[in-house]
Amino acid sequence: MGSTVPRSASVLLLLLLLRRAEQPCGAELTFELPDNAKQCFHEEVEQGVKFSLDYQVITGGHYDVDCYVEDPQGNTIYRETKKQYDSFTYRAEVKGVYQFCFSNEFSTFSHKTVYFDFQVGDEPPILPDMGNRVTALTQMESACVTIHEALKTVIDSQTHYRLREAQDRARAEDLNSRVSYWSVGETIALFVVSFSQVLLLKSFFTEKRPISRAVHS
């Protein structure tokens, strides 16, 4: 009976840990950004709360985009032009709706795909205060904290590799399209040159006979 309680508690804490790892605070989104277009997002943030923005261009053009962040008073607190990826962290000085925008207005024909991850607030403690704790429970909590940190690392690594895979796949598809078009063009050019050579050689071996006309007196 004595070993049943710690085992049940460990299972409960592990399930809670996994649930918290699956429900991060904030939002992440991948969206399409057409050429000559701008897309803005809004989030209300309390005063003194920290928020962070990570973004990366996955496909399109030179894989770059303009990005800026404005506070509720319209002041620009972050601005970068033609960035492939970047991170920005800020602690809100005033309460209100903060706006962050992505602009592709400098591009006339390149369609972009942009990914961003917007996080608000500090991460809450993994385990609530449990008052009096036995030694076994303290060791179990320490193990759960280690597992939680490892899960966060795994999630971040999976996101990073997923973005790299999407970007590499887009580049490979673009390269494949260019190679295909180039191959078709070379095939057509080769056919035209071959046909022209055949006509030229045929003209060399064609005997030109003078046309005689009978003159009737």
UniProtKB/Swiss-Prot annotation:
Topology of the protein relative to the lipid bilayer: Single-pass type I membrane protein
GOLD domain: residues covered: 38-120
InterPro entries noted in UniProt: Emp24-like, GOLD_dom, GOLD_dom_sf
Lumenal topology ranges: 24-180
Domain of life: Eukaryota
Coiled coil: none
Residue spans, topological domain Cytoplasmic: 202-217
Species lineage: Eukaryota, Metazoa, Chordata, Craniata, Vertebrata
Keywords: Cytoplasmic vesicle, Endoplasmic reticulum, Golgi apparatus, Membrane, Protein transport, Signal, Transmembrane, Transmembrane helix, Transport
PANTHER family noted in UniProt: TRANSMEMBRANE EMP24 DOMAIN-CONTAINING PROTEIN
Entry GO terms, CC: COPI vesicle coat; COPII-coated ER to Golgi transport vesicle; endoplasmic reticulum; endoplasmic reticulum membrane; endoplasmic reticulum-Golgi intermediate compartment; endoplasmic reticulum-Golgi intermediate compartment membrane; Golgi apparatus; Golgi cisterna membrane
Main subcellular location of this protein, as a coarse class: endoplasmic reticulum
Signal peptide: 1-23
GO biological process, one term: endoplasmic reticulum to Golgi vesicle-mediated transport
Any single Pfam family the record assigns to this protein: EMP24_GP25L
Entry similarity comment: Belongs to the EMP24/GP25L family.
Self-association state and partner proteins as the record states: Monomer in endoplasmic reticulum, endoplasmic reticulum-Golgi intermediate compartment and cis-Golgi network. Interacts (via C-terminus) with COPG1; the interaction involves dimeric TMED3; however, there are conflicting reports on the interaction. Interacts with GORASP1 and GORASP2.
The protein's role, per its UniProt record: Potential role in vesicular protein trafficking, mainly in the early secretory pathway. Contributes to the coupled localization of TMED2 and TMED10 in the cis-Golgi network.
Motif (COPI vesicle coat-binding): 204-217
Cellular localization per UniProt: Endoplasmic reticulum-Golgi intermediate compartment membrane; Golgi apparatus, cis-Golgi network membrane; Golgi apparatus, Golgi stack membrane; Endoplasmic reticulum membrane
Protein name: Transmembrane emp24 domain-containing protein 3
Sequence intervals crossing the membrane: 181-201
